[in-house]
């Protein structure tokens, strides 16, 4: 029985930021019912990391530009004979709607940034053990509030990210589905190719080989080196087949 493992690697800084945002929001939403100190630290640590990422660049501007670019791509696809016009029109409508919603929304992450509890916890996360009850009595008492109260507050925090989530999910879904997986073969653990202006590499490896990729490159050219999980006794086959999509 084959167990495929998917690896994704960004080929530009914009995609790197988007994948990090997606990952952090998924972590925040994974267990929205905060019932313990461990649950709280998991949520607040990811919320703090998300705010750090959002503060580094013009995320909204980049997303709006990408939504417009995807609309232009769909417009060109609409002129291809035999294409599913209904599906294309549906996607174009979703892109326009997401763009309008994103443009009308407040500054991304501002609702989280202005929350007093998130700000207090965020300040202490950089200190080893800095979230003990004597360091953060506010968090301590919050964790003793009724579960329904905490659930409602977490739901409002996550809901404030909806315009971002909606746009980012649509963009990443379109990019991920823009290319098919094709079988490739590495020689002595190495593979390289042209990026063809791709934004994202997606690799599927069989878990049985216990190999992982080390990827370097950019949109015009990239290289992949396969390494054994067991660095001491693991073996990298002379010829290794894997699946690759340049999106």
From Swiss-Prot:
HAMAP family hit by this protein: ZapD
The protein's role, per its UniProt record: Cell division factor that enhances FtsZ-ring assembly. Directly interacts with FtsZ and promotes bundling of FtsZ protofilaments, with a reduction in FtsZ GTPase activity.
Gene Ontology cellular component terms for the protein in this record: cell division site; cytoplasm
Keywords: Cell cycle, Cell division, Cytoplasm, Septation
Subcellular location(s) per record: Cytoplasm
Subunit text: Interacts with FtsZ.
Full protein name: Cell division protein ZapD
Coiled coil ranges: none
Pfam families in alphabetical order: ZapD
InterPro entries attached to this UniProt entry: ZapD, ZapD_C, ZapD_sf
One GO term of the biological process aspect: FtsZ-dependent cytokinesis
Lineage: Bacteria, Pseudomonadati, Pseudomonadota, Gammaproteobacteria, Enterobacterales
Family the UniProt entry places it in: Belongs to the ZapD family.
């Amino acid at each position: 029985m084959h167990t495929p493992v998917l690896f994704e690697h960004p080929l530009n800084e914009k995609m790197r930021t988007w994948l990090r945002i997606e990952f952090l929001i998924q972590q925040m939403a994974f267990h929205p019912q905060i019932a313990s100190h461990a649950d709280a630290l998991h949520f607040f640590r990811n919320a703090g990391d998300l705010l750090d990422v959002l503060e580094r660049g013009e995320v909204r501007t980049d997303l709006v530009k990408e939504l417009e670019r995807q609309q232009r791509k769909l417009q060109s696809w609409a002129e291809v004979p035999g294409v599913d016009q209904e599906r294309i029109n549906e996607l174009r409508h979703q892109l326009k709607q997401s763009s309008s919603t994103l443009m009308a929304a407040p500054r991304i992450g501002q609702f989280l940034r202005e929350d007093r509890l998130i700000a207090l916890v965020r300040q202490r996360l950089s200190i080893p053990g800095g979230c003990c009850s004597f360091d953060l009595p506010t968090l301590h008492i919050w964790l003793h509030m009724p579960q329904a109260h905490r659930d409602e507050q977490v739901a409002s925090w996550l809901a404030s990210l909806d315009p971002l989530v909606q746009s980012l999910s649509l963009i990443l879904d379109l990019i991920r589905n823009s290319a098919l997986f094709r079988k490739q073969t590495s020689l002595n653990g190495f593979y390289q190719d042209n990026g063809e202006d791709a934004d994202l590499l997606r690799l599927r490896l069989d878990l049985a080989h216990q190999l992982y990729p080390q990827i370097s490159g950019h949109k015009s050219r990239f290289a992949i080196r396969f390494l054994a999980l067991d660095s001491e006794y693991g073996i990298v086959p002379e010829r290794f087949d894997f699946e690759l999509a340049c999106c």
